[in-house]
Structures are given as structure tokens and as C-alpha cells.
Curated annotation (Swiss-Prot):
Lineage: Bacteria, Bacillati, Bacillota, Bacilli, Bacillales
General function of this protein: Specifically methylates the N7 position of guanine in position 535 of 16S rRNA.
Organism superkingdom: Bacteria
InterPro entries (UniProt xref): rRNA_ssu_MeTfrase_G, SAM-dependent_MTases_sf
Keywords: Cytoplasm, Methyltransferase, rRNA processing, S-adenosyl-L-methionine, Transferase
E.C. number(s) listed in UniProt: 2.1.1.-
Signal peptide location: none
Name used for this protein in its record: Ribosomal RNA small subunit methyltransferase G
Molecular-function GO term, any one: rRNA (guanine-N7-)-methyltransferase activity
Protein location: Cytoplasm
TM region(s), chain numbering: none
Native source organism of the sequence: Staphylococcus aureus (strain NCTC 8325 / PS 47)
Region Disordered, residue ranges: 215-239
Protein's UniProt keywords contain Iron: no
Positions annotated to bind S-adenosyl-L-methionine: 77, 82, 128-129, 146
Length: 239
């Protein structure tokens, strides 16, 4: 009864899973495994591991950041929808946009959202570098990303999308602190300021996680993000 395990874990953080939410997570797992057979969405397919390392891991940021408010979230490179779809299931009032460079993942997300009957979600097939130059630049309350690149690179992809006064919530595994040191220059150049750092353990010794909350204090200079591929090849680092 893996969804019951998730419910028990969340109860320890004063979060109650409704019957509807339980059904949504069960459907999410079923579709993830079905679609994963025809496209590579995740290397984690064991049911308990998905609930622990994808679902619980995606919801854990809400222990430290208030997602229970009507805010717009952009999730950069969410793959199979992590963390934003589990957060949307838990906090239905969120307005969620996912940007991903692989169209097959967007097809999965569209089908998933339809099956889960999610409202106020949109999935955009684009590179984050291009998306951050367009009409959505500096338009989101919160931008999130879960370990898709080093923090110096992620900051250039994500901070341009955050509105002034909003937050970039970066989710990393255990090496986050050294990445944060390296990324401080880029964060400052891009208009951000690190305001909170949280370190926590997943249940069952499944690993350490770090979460950085970066406030958007100033507008990002127009030249950022640079053209696709450049942030990854030559990250913004202090010379």
C-alpha cells in the first residue's frame, strides 16, 4: 500500500492526503510506468522508489516553503513532471508551467494532466535559454528546478524567468553546498540573493537533499540567458 506510506510520511509534516489526491498519485505512478516502456522518462520504476524518490522528494520543498497560496510556478526541465506535478496535486490552486526541451516528455505531461484532471497547467516545448528571452521573462512568482544542472548553470536558466520580488527554488542532492559557493557570482549577476538554505534527509536513508531559496532582488540584465548551450559550456563564474 505505497500511497498509504506516502500519506503516513506526509502526516508527520501535518499534511493530509485526501482520497482524490491518493487516486491521483496512483494514476500518476501507473501512467509513468506505462509510458516509460516506450520512452525514457525515469530510471526509477519500482513502485516504492517512485513514491519515495519522486513523489515524496517533490513534495518535501513544501515543508520549508509555503506553496499553499495562489502563485504561478515555472518548472524548468521537469522531465516526467518533478517536482511541479506532485506539488500541483497537493496544492491545486498553483498555476503551473513546465518547460522541457524534449517533445515526447511534453506529450506525456499533456496526457498525464488530462488523466489527473489538472486545471491551470501548461506544458511548453522549448529550451530554457530561448523561453527566458520571450514574453514569459520575469513573469513567474516562483521558478523551480530539480537537479538538472549545476547551480551556476541553473541560475542562468531560471532567474531570468522570476519576477522581481519572486523566488527561485533550487533543489539539489548532497553536493549542493559546494555548487552554491561556485554559483554565488552568477546568482548576483542575474539579480538574485540566496536567502535560505535547507538540508534534509529523505526517509529510509534514501539520501540527503538541499534546497536553496533565492530571492529575485533586481532585474536580470538583458543579455542573459545566453544562447542555447552556452550556459552549460561556459557557466558564469567569478574570474
Amino acid at each position: 500500500m505505497t500511497v498509504e506510506w506516502l500519506a503516513e510520511q506526509l502526516k508527520e509534516h501535518n499534511i493530509q492526503l485526501t482520497e482524490t489526491q491518493k487516486q491521483q498519485f496512483q494514476t500518476y505512478y501507473r501512467l509513468l510506468v506505462e509510458w516509460n516502456e516506450k520512452m525514457n522518462l525515469t530510471s526509477i520504476t519500482d513502485e516504492h522508489d517512485v513514491y519515495l524518490k519522486h513523489f515524496y522528494d517533490s513534495i518535501a520543498p513544501s515543508f520549508y516553503f509555503d506553496f499553499n497560496q495562489p502563485i504561478s510556478i515555472c518548472d524548468v526541465g521537469a522531465g516526467a513532471g518533478f517536482p511541479s506535478i506532485p506539488l500541483k496535486i497537493m496544492f491545486p490552486q498553483l498555476k503551473v508551467t513546465i518547460v522541457d526541451s524534449l517533445n515526447k516528455r511534453i506529450q506525456f505531461l499533456n496526457h498525464l494532466a488530462s488523466e489527473l484532471q489538472l486545471q491551470d497547467v501548461s506544458f511548453i516545448h522549448d529550451r530554457a535559454e530561448t523561453f527566458g528571452k520571450g514574453v514569459y521573462r520575469e513573469s513567474y512568482d516562483v521558478v523551480t528546478a530539480r537537479a538538472v544542472a549545476r547551480l551556476s548553470v541553473l541560475s542562468e536558466l531560471c532567474l531570468p524567468l522570476v519576477k522581481k520580488g519572486g523566488q527561485f527554488v533550487a533543489l539539489k542532492s548532497s553536493k549542493g553546498e559546494e555548487e552554491l559557493e561556485e554559483a554565488k557570482f552568477a546568482i548576483s549577476v542575474l539579480g538574485g540573493n540566496v536567502t535560505e538554505t535547507h538540508t534534509f534527509e529523505l526517509p529510509e536513508d534514501a539520501g540527503e537533499r538541499q534546497m536553496f531559496i533565492i530571492d529575485k532582488k533586481r532585474q536580470t540584465p538583458k543579455k542573459y540567458p545566453r544562447k542555447p548551450g552556452t550556459p552549460n559550456k561556459t557557466p558564469l563564474l567569478e574570474k
